[in-house]
Curated annotation (Swiss-Prot):
Record InterPro entries: LIM1_Testin (IPR034958), LIM2_Testin (IPR034959), LIM3_Testin (IPR034960), PET_domain (IPR010442), PET_testin (IPR033724), Pk/Esn/Tes (IPR047120), Znf_LIM (IPR001781)
Name of this chain's protein: Testin
Pfam families: LIM, PET
Quaternary structure and partners: Interacts via LIM domain 1 with ZYX. Interacts (via LIM domain 3) with ENAH and VASP. Interacts with ALKBH4, talin, actin, alpha-actinin, GRIP1 and PXN. Interacts (via LIM domain 2) with ACTL7A (via N-terminus). Heterodimer with ACTL7A; the heterodimer interacts with ENAH to form a heterotrimer.
Presence of keyword Cytoplasm: yes
Organism: Muntiacus reevesi
Functional summary from the UniProt entry: Scaffold protein that may play a role in cell adhesion, cell spreading and in the reorganization of the actin cytoskeleton. Plays a role in the regulation of cell proliferation. May act as a tumor suppressor.
Length: 421
């Protein structure tokens, strides 16, 4: 795909989810409207994952593209219409008879994702070992959690140049090489197994999720398996607690066949969130989600949230920025050489700070300039001047003096306080 086509495709992405309500801001947000280059809503400044955007097909395309040209192609299918790879996520539907007084009804539970194993009982056990609020039951808090983690852990702009803002041809090429490298060296998908089954696993046997699930024994493993199992004690690589014989465990091929995790312990070592759909990246003995693996390899722009492939970028406030994206969070004016104030880890220009964020002086009731000295006590502030920081009774200047605060007032003495009470 040429660069012009990629830019056109990027523009179409701004139409997705338009007008969707914000789950965090509720009625305060007029509806989702994607900022031109930030990955946030222009109206409320929350991310797309905080909005009720229906993106199941888009997410399946994103994960499908991630698995393209990897050993995990068994987990994708290509659409006949345009050849786009789609993620074949495993959906599990459980039916439980519910006895009533006169008849028996059927209670159906649908999991929007489940481990791709043939043994449904094993998949069900896996789900039960996850925190209830993280079980991806359709229409539940857990399904919303999975949706949010798909967006957070596997950003489309970490693998697809067409989802990025104005990359140069050189940057596009570097990004494509970077993606190819992490697909071949770090990307993996966990597999759910019983610890006793790990005795058939070894360096000469490889498992591909969604592929052949035969129980072929590893080369050289000819001794009695029951005797071998009695000698083997498995513990979780994360929490170090022992594995129970009948409980499912997660195996990550890139980590080695000797390492297992409890389902609830298969988390990113940086954000400590469950690895969504058991998709992991392995580096230096640690599990990472896609986002934090990429962060360990490349600087990420704090403005657009994209990885930086340019040799020239700026660093400020312990964060990295594309030169063109070091801008005011409120008005988008470039801040190079300008005075700015950090508000919730976001840079804001001086005019926007005074207009939208500055504290108000209790004395003169005007906004306090960020470069001006002030006196603060609890949630109240004053200009540190002889005109503003005064006794609320006798107007004596209190700079450098002891004072008695009472809500938004200050007094120089008990007598003045009594006179105002």
């Amino acid at each position: 795909m040429d660069l012009e086509a990629k830019v056109k495709k990027m523009g179409l992405g701004h139409e997705q989810g338009f007008g969707a309500p914000c789950l965090k801001c509720k009625e305060k947000c007029e509806g989702f409207e994607l900022h031109f280059w930030r990955k946030i809503c222009r109206n409320c400044k929350c991310g797309q994952e905080e909005h009720d955007v229906l993106l199941s097909n888009e997410e399946d395309r994103k994960v499908g593209k991630l698995f393209e040209d990897t050993k995990y192609t068994t987990l994708i299918a290509k659409l006949k219409s345009d050849g786009i790879p789609m993620y074949k996520r495993n959906v599990m539907i459980l039916t439980n008879p519910v006895a009533a007084k006169k008849n028996v009804s059927i209670n159906t539970v649908t999991y929007e994702w489940a481990p791709p194993v043939q043994n449904q009982a094993l998949a069900r056990q896996y789900m039960q070992m996850l925190p209830k609020e993280k079980q991806p039951v359709a229409g539940s808090e857990g399904a919303q959690y999975r949706k949010k983690q798909l967006a957070k852990q596997l950003p489309a702009h970490d693998q697809d140049p067409s989802k990025c803002h104005e990359l140069s041809p050189k940057e596009v090429k570097e990004m494509e090489q970077f993606v190819k490298k992490y697909k071949s060296e770090a990307l993996g998908v966990g597999d759910v197994k019983l610890p006793r089954d790990m005795n058939t696993q070894g360096p000469n046997r490889m498992y591909i999720p969604g592929g052949d699930r035969s129980t072929t024994t590893a080369v050289g493993a000819m001794e009695d398996k029951s005797a071998e199992h009695k000698r083997t004690q498995y513990s979780c690589y994360c929490c170090k607690l022992s594995m129970k014989e009948g409980d499912p465990a997660i195996y990550a091929e890139r980590a080695g066949y000797d390492k297992l995790w409890h389902p609830a312990c298969f988390v990113c070592s940086a954000c400590h969130e469950l690895l969504v759909d058991m998709i992991y990246f392995w580096k230096n003995g640690k599990l990472y989600c896609g986002r934090h693996y990429c962060d360990s390899e490349k600087p990420r722009c704090a403005g657009c949230d994209e990885l930086i492939f340019s040799n020239e970028y700026t660093q400020a406030e312990n964060q990295n920025w594309h030169l063109k994206h070091f801008c005011c969070f409120d008005c988008d004016n470039i801040l190079a050489g300008e005075i700015y104030v950090m508000v919730n880890d976001k840079p804001v220009c001086k005019p926007c700070y005074v207009k939208n964020h500055a504290v108000v002086c209790q004395g003169c009731h005007n906004a306090i300039d960020p470069e001006v000295q002030r006196v603060s006590y609890n949630n109240f502030s004053w200009h540190a001047s002889t005109e503003c920081f005064l006794c609320s009774c006798c107007s004596r200047c209190l700079i450098g003096q002891k004072f008695m605060p009472v809500e938004g007032m200050v007094f120089c003495s008990v007598e003045c306080k009594k006179m105002m009470s």
